[in-house]
């Protein structure tokens, strides 16, 4: 576990995953962490919203994702852990599979439950899908 992808949404469960890695890095200081926050694209049907408005909504979602990632990045930086932040639009599991391949990650460390855009606890089903679809080991942190 040297190059780790962490799906991060700011939920208590995701915070525990970051805390786990901070402690892990005390023993394995060569750890590299990729924080990723995946936002769902705004999709509105009909002629109610212009394409420019949809672009603004998506840009706002990515800005929000960067703010969320920044909180965990501060903790990783304070612990001296090499890290990078990634904010993407798309379907969560699909984007996580892409990120694992793109960044050469050999492990995914994630919480068992997270927050949806509406504040509902939904990551349990996402965690299950990640375990089945990501081509590397997945460590779930309770």
Model regions and ranges:
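Small/aliphatic-rich secondary-structure junction motif
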Residues: 2-52
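Glycine-rich, Arg-bearing micro-motifs that act as flexible, cationic patches
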Residues: 3, 107-132
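Conserved beta-strand positions in the Rossmann-like core of class I SAM-dependent methyltransferases
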Residues: 34, 84, 139
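Short, hinge-like loop/turn segments at secondary-structure boundaries
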Residues: 51-53, 102-104, 126-127
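A short acidic, glycine-rich active-site loop
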Residues: 53-67
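Structural beta-alpha unit
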Residues: 74-108
């Amino acid at each position: 576990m040297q190059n780790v992808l962490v799906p991060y949404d700011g939920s208590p469960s995701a915070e525990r995953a970051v805390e786990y890695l901070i402690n892990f890095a005390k023993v394995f200081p060569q750890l590299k962490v990729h924080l990723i926050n995946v936002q769902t694209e705004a999709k509105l049907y009909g002629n109610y919203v212009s394409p420019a408005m949809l672009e603004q909504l998506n840009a706002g979602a990515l800005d929000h994702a960067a703010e969320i990632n920044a909180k965990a990045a501060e903790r990783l930086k304070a612990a001296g852990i090499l890290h990078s932040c990634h904010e993407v639009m798309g379907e969560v599991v699909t984007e996580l599979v892409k990120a694992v391949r793109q960044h050469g990650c050999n492990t995914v460390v994630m919480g068992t439950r997270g927050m949806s855009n509406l504040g509902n606890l939904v990551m349990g089903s996402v965690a299950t899908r990640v375990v089945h679809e990501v081509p590397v080991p997945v460590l779930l942190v309770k």
